Amino acid sequence: MNKNLIEVKNLTFKRGERVIYDNLNLKVQQGKITAIMGPSGIGKTTLLKLIGGQLHPEQGEILFDGQDICRLSNRELYEVRKRMGMLFQSGALFTDISTFDNVAFPIREHTRLPESLIRQIVLMKLEAVGLRGAADLMPSELSGGMARRAALARAIPLDPDLIMFDEPFTGQDPISMGVIVSLIKRLNEALNLTSIVVSHDVNEILSIADYAYIIADKHVIAEG
């Protein structure tokens, strides 16, 4: 049986006086694709930021491989984040540098590898998402689907244990959506990833998810 890479226990989180989560509990199995669904505005993106340590809850635990994210020092959190990749809804590519340099950025930030090796890694990751030929293009020259795939390549160069996708299908045409759905599945298997996918595109995400949670009214209301 797979162990849990993520365990959220009795999580309560507020924005001002508004309660976003009240005693929320969920688990993410290692090596699996877990879907998180629910209506807009209930804090699905907020949950990813809590798991990534960007936000702190009022109470509860968020365990990543047994470590409570909420209790880590800044240095410890920095080390843990090297094992995480995030693909936000916006894609969030740096607009003033090439696709190649976007993917290379986290490698240069977190390692001291020689440029020759960085080049090999970046081209390999671009190849994995079907963008090797776009390495020298600027983000403004990419289509919406290509930009989303470039952002995905930038999330995986350090071979993370966990990758979190925030509405990865939003704004994509049916062909691009199909490509991204299959990429998430293929990369999860090829890189032995654990994936959390936040989405309201039910058909797409359930076609690849191993487990799904539906969140509404501050709680998990269904799972399976």
Residue ranges and their predicted role:
Residues 52:
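Helix-to-loop junction immediately C-terminal to a conserved catalytic motif
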Residues 67-68, 115-133:
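Conserved ABC ATPase "signature" region
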Residues 138-142, 146:
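Conserved ABC ATPase signature
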Residues 159:
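Conserved catalytic motifs of ABC-family nucleotide-binding domains
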Residues 163-166:
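Catalytic Walker B motif of ABC-type/P-loop ATPase nucleotide-binding domains
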